[in-house]
Swiss-Prot record:
<dbReference type="GO" id="GO:0018583">
    <property type="term" value="F:biphenyl-2,3-diol 1,2-dioxygenase activity"/>
</dbReference>
<feature type="binding site">
    <location>
        <position position="149"/>
    </location>
    <ligand>
        <name>Fe cation</name>
    </ligand>
</feature>
<dbReference type="Pfam" id="PF00903">
    <property type="entry name" value="Glyoxalase"/>
</dbReference>
<dbReference type="InterPro" id="IPR017626">
    <property type="entry name" value="DiOHbiphenyl_dOase"/>
</dbReference>
<comment type="similarity">
    <text>Belongs to the extradiol ring-cleavage dioxygenase family.</text>
</comment>
<dbReference type="InterPro" id="IPR000486">
    <property type="entry name" value="Xdiol_ring_cleave_dOase_1/2"/>
</dbReference>
<feature type="binding site">
    <location>
        <position position="263"/>
    </location>
    <ligand>
        <name>Fe cation</name>
    </ligand>
</feature>
<feature type="binding site">
    <location>
        <position position="212"/>
    </location>
    <ligand>
        <name>Fe cation</name>
    </ligand>
</feature>
<keyword id="KW-0408">Iron</keyword>
<keyword id="KW-0058">Aromatic hydrocarbons catabolism</keyword>
<protein>
    <recommendedName>
        <fullName>Biphenyl-2,3-diol 1,2-dioxygenase</fullName>
        <ecNumber>1.13.11.39</ecNumber>
    </recommendedName>
</protein>
<dbReference type="InterPro" id="IPR029068">
    <property type="entry name" value="Glyas_Bleomycin-R_OHBP_Dase"/>
</dbReference>
<dbReference type="InterPro" id="IPR004360">
    <property type="entry name" value="Glyas_Fos-R_dOase_dom"/>
</dbReference>
<keyword id="KW-0223">Dioxygenase</keyword>
<feature type="domain" description="VOC 2">
    <location>
        <begin position="146"/>
        <end position="267"/>
    </location>
</feature>
<keyword id="KW-0479">Metal-binding</keyword>
<keyword id="KW-0560">Oxidoreductase</keyword>
Length: 299
């Protein structure tokens, strides 16, 4: 059965490219690639041409996210599968695929209206070693696990789960979180490879399409260094350092220049083969800066 293999890339619209250039390189450690186009910057995390594209814009939000399939046969099968399910999509032109640095591309939207892309054949620049934007002890966890994970806006969780299930992701509710208003939050997590989850939703109403992007370091010291830099620069921290119950990653959440969150992490376990749910995190993740959509009782 055809299925996506990883969350391969993201495109973001940003109102301040200069602030992002500093944040991505000096705080996160990503490599900045400026090809002189004027309206965009590319962020590298490994030997791919890029994992993130920053598009200069008058808004700050998710522009698109790309899900990878293995090859052109799988690509055609996925297009046929989605079309048969009644999902409207457009197979992109060769020029559009070249702009994304891939061999094949289809464009559609998920049930939350998030621009979604299916692709195969990313450009991988093995002749250009990854050079982090600041000193790093290790690397980013990418490879077959993709860029990381993101939490997206979805008003209809069952419809979103069905859509991502059609793409080949698996998962379910992984937390029951008692809220101060008496309600119980039940966020939904889904995976398509060994990464514990690649997409999640069900946090309730969101101003932007995306709540946060999580990426992971291979070395704990890089997480600690990033945490020190964030604190020294007085960047808003929405959730303090803590350890999740589901992926068991040590992480913290801080604001990026676009006013939503990046989750910096280390040490996540692999995706489980059977479903579990939790009522709180292992430790930490106390709420700090409010207003970023993560004012939930994880600790």
């Amino acid at each position: 059965m055809v299925a996506v293999t990883e969350l391969g890339y993201l495109g973001l619209t940003v109102t301040n490219l200069d602030a992002w250039r500093s944040y991505a390189a000096e705080v996160a450690g990503m490599e900045i690639v400026d090809e002189g186009e004027g309206d965009r910057l590319y962020l590298r995390m490994d030997q791919w041409h890029h994992r993130i594209v920053l598009h200069a814009s008058d808004s700050d939000d998710l522009a698109y996210l790309g899900w990878r399939v293995a090859d052109p046969v799988e690509f055609d099968a996925m297009v046929a599968k989605l079309t048969a399910a009644g999902i409207s999509l457009t197979v992109a032109s060769e020029a559009e695929a070249r702009e994304r640095r891939v061999l094949g591309l289809a464009k559609l939207a998920d049930p939350g209206g998030n621009p979604t892309e299916i692709f195969y054949g990313p450009q991988v620049d093995t002749h250009k070693p990854f050079h982090p934007g600041r000193p790093m002890y290790g690397k980013f966890v990418t490879g077959s696990e993709g860029i990381g994970h993101c939490i997206l806006r979805q008003d209809d969780v069952p419809a979103a789960a069905a859509f991502y299930g059609l793409l080949g992701l698996r998962g379910s509710v992984e937390y029951h979180l008692q809220l101060p208003n008496g309600m119980v939050a039940q966020p939904y997590f889904m995976h398509c490879n060994e990464r514990q989850h690649s997409v999640a939703f069900g946090l309730g109403p969101m101003e932007k399409r995306i709540n946060h992007l999580m990426f992971e370091y291979t070395d704990l010291d890089d997480l600690g260094l990033a945490h020190d830099i964030v604190r020294a620069r007085k960047i808003d921290v929405a959730l303090q350092l803590g350890k999740h119950a589901n992926d068991q990653a040590l992480t913290f959440y801080c604001a990026n220049p676009s006013g939503w969150l990046w989750e910096f992490g280390w040490g996540a376990r692999k995706a489980p083969s059977q479903q579990e749910y939790y009522t709180r995190d292992i430790f930490g993740h106390g709420n700090e800066a409010a207003g970023y959509g993560m004012d939930i009782p994880l600790g």
